[in-house]
Amino acid sequence: MKKILSTLTLTTALVSANVIADIRIGLDSAPYPPFSETNASGELVGWEVEIGAALCEAMGETCEVVPVAWDGIIPALLAKKIDAIVGSMSITEERMKTIAFSDKYYNTPAALVAAKSADIDGSPDSVKGKIIGVQVSTTHQNYAQAYFESMADSIKTYQNFDEHNQDLASGRIDAVVGDSLAFEGFLTSDAGKDFEIKASLNDEAIFGPGVGAGIRKEDTELLARFNAAIAQIRADGTYQKISDKYFDFDIYGD
């Protein structure tokens, strides 16, 4: 595995693969800014990378970040290839049948994005005959299937967030469903300048109460330590200090 140090300030908690780590943290191998991405120097950077490092430091553990394809990340956890998922995974009842979750560490709404000129408002009728893009194995896919599938031409799945944004920009699909915050990079780019958020999408039964760390059900001690670490970095200001570098609002949510 290639070296994936985040930044020099994080090396006390995140290590490269040639060092034996106490905890292996899995996240999506595809870029997902501002949460995680690889910079020009080959370093893994982003808000969630820094939060993961802070949690490891709070637990007094050395952690290795292991990039995993999103649709294989829960199987990797169950197969003990990783020990925890700190990768923007929503806490849902369906996933909790298979794995356990820590307390939430952030919560942002989902959104429907389409061309500024498109007459789409987030209602099922407004996507009639449209092709909707979603990342596979996500709550966004579940929402699109529940609310839009009966009216849309089709729901097209993609392996990662960037792929459906590229197809949207090229006109191969009409709209995409994803995390509202993750769309910011696309919407402020040249490729995304003609697109906008058409609607915020809410359904707690689908999206859950927020994002938590995914843990194997039997690892109850590790789960308790993650919960304690989340509470600690929230209380001591570390969480806010990291968040202020990326956001001008409270990402923790309600």
Locate each region found by the language model.
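Ligand-binding clefts/hinges and TM-proximal coupling segments of bilobed small-molecule sensing domains
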Residues: T62-E64, H140-K156, D194-I197, N227-D254
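Short helices/loops that flank or line small-molecule/ion binding pockets
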Residues: E57-A58, V66-P67, D71-D83, T98-A100, ...
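Periplasmic-binding protein-like
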Residues: S29-A30, N107-A114, T188-A228, F247-D254
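A ligand-binding cleft/hinge motif common to bilobed small-molecule-binding domains
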Residues: G72-P75, M89-K97, Y143-A146, D174-F207
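A conserved helix-loop-strand patch within extracytoplasmic ligand-binding domains
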Residues: E61-E64, S90, D103-A152
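Ligand-binding cleft/hinge of the Venus flytrap
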Residues: F35-A40, G52-E61, H140-Q159, N165, ...
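Extracytoplasmic small-molecule ligand-binding "clamshell" domains
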Residues: D22-S88, K97, D236, F249
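Extended ligand-binding regions for polar small-molecule ligands
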Residues: V49-A58, A118, D125-S126, K130-I131, ...
